[in-house]
Amino acid sequence: MKILKTLTLRGPNYWSIRRKKLIVMRLDLEDLAERPSNSIPGFYEGLIRVLPSLVEHFCSPGHRGGFLARVREGTYMGHIVEHVALELQELVGMTAGFGRTRETSTPGIYNVVYEYVDEQAGRYAGRAAVRLCRSLVDTGDYSLTELEKDLEDLRDLGANSALGPSTETIVTEADARKIPWMLLSARAMVQLGYGVHQQRIQATLSSHSGILGVELACDKEGTKTILQDAGIPVPRGTTIQYFDDLEEAINDVGGYPVVIKPLDGNHGRGITINVRHWEEAIAAYDLAAEESKSRSIIVERYYEGSDHRVLVVNGKLVAVAERIPAHVTGDGTSTITELIDKTNQDPNRGDGHANILTKIVVNKTAIDVMERQGYNLDSVLPKDEVVYLRATANLSTGGIAIDRTDDIHPENIWLMERVAKVIGLDIAGIDVVTSDISKPLRETNGVIVEVNAAPGFRMHVAPSQGLPRNVAAPVLDMLFPSGTPSRIPILAVTGTNGKTTTTRLLAHIYRQTGKTVGYTSTDAIYINEYCVEKGDNTGPQSAAVILRDPTVEVAVLETARGGILRAGLAFDTCDVGVVLNVAADHLGLGDIDTIEQMAKVKSVIAEVVDPSGYAVLNADDPLVAAMADKVKAKVAYFSMNPDNPVIQNHIRRNGIAAVYESGYVSILEGSWTLRVEEATLIPMTMGGMAPFMIANALAACLAAFVNGLDVEVIRQGVRTFTTSAEQTPGRMNLFNLGRYHALVDYAHNPAGYRAVGDFVKNWHGQRFGVVGGPGDRRDSDLIELGQIAAQVFDRIIVKEDDDKRGRSGGETADLIVKGILQENPGAAYEVILDETVALNKALDQVEEKGLVVVFPESVSKAIELIKARKPIG
């Protein structure tokens, strides 16, 4: 077996609309292509020995053990690799259940599709599954050592790229509210929402977190001073820079016991509490100095009581947790080392922040804390004796939490909310020491020890005891108050031909509203009139540029088949999805071999439309019209024929449609007709002589209308939109050169050639074509381009693209010539492979009042060449 290619899908895609995170592994079975599993000695027995948990896979039989029954009866290796890849992820806690395996048009080569949780781990699982299955084929076994290494690697990959627990809590709540989100950086900054409505979080810092409040919270001494000046109880303390000042500082705060900690520490690192004599103070100072970047050490009075963390969000208390330091409880027989090992076996404990709780790590701090209690790692604890392993109660060092939200006294609630406002934090974690949180701090001699920016949520979301608290909900309530949108209107456009023109027209229409419009196209990414990036930008990365931009109010996204197949969509849903047509282009690429398969690719756009939105479908294209059966949204149709049965049936059901009737672009709904504009007054239709441009206008007008735009705005948009080289480069760009005209169009498939041909056939004068085609198209497609050219043009020059796309020089041209001669053996043609030379010759030799039509590889170069020619009177 050999992996030929691996794709990672991150959005709705060809294989599944709902399951966005999929690996597509193109697998060559090689010598196993004709060997089902029941013909491989020992394979079934080895598989259930190595992965007995595969018994839980139902597969097509639909019951426990169903997949293993398929293996025993005989199934092919691609199918088995799919299930093994899923199970390897399951064994490390990454539950992924969806899979598909389909043979391609090349015998023995399969697309193995399976779900993933973590991208890197998902790709690794596929490679490991192939290794495992190959080993079982060759030897009947796969060592448990190798399996454990695979699982360990999977865990590591997942842990390295996983979101932190607090971030995970927030994005899970965002998912529940259907607020879209995306990662912005490796530091786990997350964007919530799209465009102008976006908010950002990093851990539990948010777009609302003020820099002054965060900086103040990081300055422990400054925080204490501000709180003290506000009359809020804080520990008596001082800050020193040198060891020589330590003894005096202890005396200044009232003597022992004291707390010694770094000024700039976090997560409890470098802190020693309840320091009771000089030797302990020396050790505590050294520990704090190791963790301090500034050399500044805080010495504070130690206050008896329990450690509490109070969470305040947007000025309101939302949760309280009592924190217990890492500890073990004796059973009368086990050593402390053994008790720690038993504690760490708790499935809720993981490394770092990987789980609800953190495993207890034995380090110098733990040993020092034990020794202060009179124990060491080999000590056998009496039954029920508790030994603490950390001085502080941070969950990140193995502590646990008990929910106390319902216990806190109302006066303390008021005080904590005041603390957050005094410091200036939108999300504040306030550390309180008090003997009883249910009583006012003034009665218990309690104090505010610290105020933290970016507080952790684990202790509140999953306390060891007490009620879990959904603390992410108030965060999202703050970022997106009731009635505040998180999304911007998204209009997605796909099809074989006309995508770019329709996208640009839609964007132009929306600009009439005064909104900031971002759009992607084959030519470039634009925000309003400003070009962000030139080039083919019709994939998910380009769409994400628009969705990430904080100025964009409306997104119009040209969406080509390549991006859908390669990575899925950048968005989970859209408001309007336009499918213009499906034609025989790009067939044979990406395992899309039939026009029906291509229709399934394009259908993704229609299927992701939100139920409240509209799928705008071409009623004149049966493959597109049939997509309505899969759509969950409302449907609106457009047609060049008002009598189209699909249109008539739709209107009878009070549906909305756009049609070309009596020379007008009109919108129909039920019994009424709304005429948007006469086609001859829409510049892009070339005076009504370009039917395919009228169809594009119908689609754009209908999309804008169903998304709520006023007809007057739409009318203004179509009246002022032109097919100039500046506004729509490569889309019916007509140049008047005085003695003759030149037309530039990026058509590169038979349907596109026919559409341009419908316009060219009406030209009164010589029709001179400079024709070519992409080398990666099928032979039959290139031959058909030649046939169409022979039908349309009086004279033809056949040229080739510089990028041969896998063909040898002259091969593409030969196929086009073959089509020309099949259609018209006496056709006037010649072959000039260089595009520039070919176009120059056509421009030099075209007859007066003639039309030169070029289908260029480089639109910009062709336009530049034509513009350089001065009009000849």
Swiss-Prot record:
Record-listed E.C. numbers: 6.3.2.29, 6.3.2.30
Keyword entries, A-Z: ATP-binding, Ligase, Nucleotide-binding
Pfam families: Cyanophycin_syn (PF18921), Mur_ligase_C (PF02875), Mur_ligase_M (PF08245), RimK (PF08443)
GO molecular function, one term: ATP binding
One example of a Gene Ontology biological process annotation: biosynthetic process
Top-level class of the enzyme under EC nomenclature: ligase
Top-level taxon in the UniProt lineage: Bacteria
Domain ATP-grasp stretches: 224-480
Reactions this protein catalyses: [L-4-(L-arginin-2-N-yl)aspartate](n) + L-aspartate + ATP = [L-4-(L-arginin-2-N-yl)aspartate](n)-L-aspartate + ADP + phosphate + H(+); [L-4-(L-arginin-2-N-yl)aspartate](n)-L-aspartate + L-arginine + ATP = [L-4-(L-arginin-2-N-yl)aspartate](n+1) + ADP + phosphate + H(+)
InterPro entries: ATP-grasp, ATP-grasp_RimK-type, Cya_phycin_syn, Cyanophycin_syn_N, Mur-like_cat_sf, Mur_ligase_C, Mur_ligase_C_dom_sf, Mur_ligase_cen
Family under the similarity heading: In the C-terminal section; belongs to the MurCDEF family.
Function: Catalyzes the ATP-dependent polymerization of arginine and aspartate to multi-L-arginyl-poly-L-aspartic acid (cyanophycin; a water-insoluble reserve polymer).
Assembly notes: Homodimer.
Protein's name in the database: Cyanophycin synthetase
Protein species of origin: Synechocystis sp. (strain ATCC 27184 / PCC 6803 / Kazusa)
Lineage, highest ranks first: Bacteria, Bacillati, Cyanobacteriota, Cyanophyceae, Synechococcales
